[in-house]
Amino acid sequence: MINMKIARLVRDGHETYGLIRDGKVATKDNMVNQTGVPLPFSIMDFLFEGWYDEIKDRIISTSFQDKLETFSILNPLPNPSKIICLTFNYPKHAKEQNYESTKEPVIFIKPRTTLCGTNSEIRCPNFVKQLDYEIEL
């Protein structure tokens, strides 16, 4: 099995999605050209309507034509309804903060507006006294 990641990407103002492997990207258009499968425009349709399963065995190494560093990685999903988070999934960090681990997971939600892409700015209002970047991963 080949190890690949799925991502939303933008380059030169053009948004797309693609598969990432070894620092190279197979964009939606690359995959369509290589496989002949008419992939959907939306990453949501690609993920949740079985398209990945349709093409995963057809993807060949020549589909990965573009260097990842030529793209900006966007937040994973456009307009999710909510983000469900789990606290203390980093036990070492909890210990550093002098928090006692709980036996049960602590779950909380965040608004969808808190999502951002890789290397994007994390906005912090002036009234925030402590921003825990490890919680913001």
Predicted segment positions?
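N-terminal non-catalytic cap/leader segment that marks the start of a structured domain
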Residues: I2-P105
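Glycine-enriched loop-and-adjacent helix/strand subsegments that border the catalytic/binding cleft
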Residues: P80-L137
